[in-house]
Amino acid sequence: YFGAAANEEREADWPEMKFFSSMDSPYPVAVNYRLLLPKILGDEVQKILYLDGDIICRGSIAELWQADLGSLLAAGVPDPLEAMHRRRLPEVKRYVNSGVLLMNLQLWRQENILGRAMECYQTMKDFGYPDQDVINRVCNGRIGLLPQSWNYPVSCNFAVQGRRNDIVPEARLCHFLGPVTKPWYVTCLDPRAQLWRSFRERSFWRDQPMSGAGSELEAEMRQIVRMFEDGQEAP
């Protein structure tokens, strides 16, 4: 839906796109597109399941889709680093990972969540994870909690963590977390990356070369630096 040319066209009509594009942030503007979903989609779309691009679906999501949000603005799975995030944002009751969000678009429109998110960006000084921090702050107290099977964390930075969690059978949505060693990098040596690669072999993009991201050691060193910057304790 979004591309470079499309972004320029929408910036002329949408002040929200211009706002997000003008932000001084190390993160790509695309991380904020989920906030625009109530505006992108017509009013007839009252609910949507948002998934990050680094997620693999391993079973039916009908049960998740049929969940009744009621007066909740969204539902998500607690972030693996929730304790660390709540130290930064003590006012947030629960902190969910924004990679899987069941969103109540009807209420997002009625309560102007997009506008409130933009205001939050203007007033917050410390952003660990911009869109995720904003969603958890603006929707504070009205985010339902989902079982971990709906956003099962898979970190390929196993040399940094010193441990590896096996992908359990009940995991429906597997999320390859972390900013560096992704399964589509040729330097990713984690055996669990084979799950993602097995799906790739069945896709239209199977003949496209995978990305190079420097050595795995370099990627893991960058992750260590980020852990200290975020105040995360070394494992």
Residue ranges and their predicted role:
Residues 1-39:
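Active-site-proximal specificity loops/subdomain of glycosyltransferases
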Residues 4, 13-16, 55-57, 80-82, ...:
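Short, solvent-exposed loop/turn segments at secondary-structure junctions
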Residues 11, 30-81, 93-95, 102-106:
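GT-A fold catalytic core of metal-dependent nucleotide-sugar glycosyltransferases
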Residues 19-20, 83-87, 155:
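Short, charged, surface-exposed secondary-structure boundary motifs
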Residues 25, 86-92, 117-126:
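Active-site rim elements
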Residues 39-41, 64-67, 90-93, 126-127, ...:
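A general structural signal for short secondary-structure junctions and capping/turn motifs
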Residues 48-53, 59-63, 85-89, 111-117, ...:
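A short secondary-structure junction signal
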Residues 98, 103-235:
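A glycosyltransferase accessory/donor-loop signature
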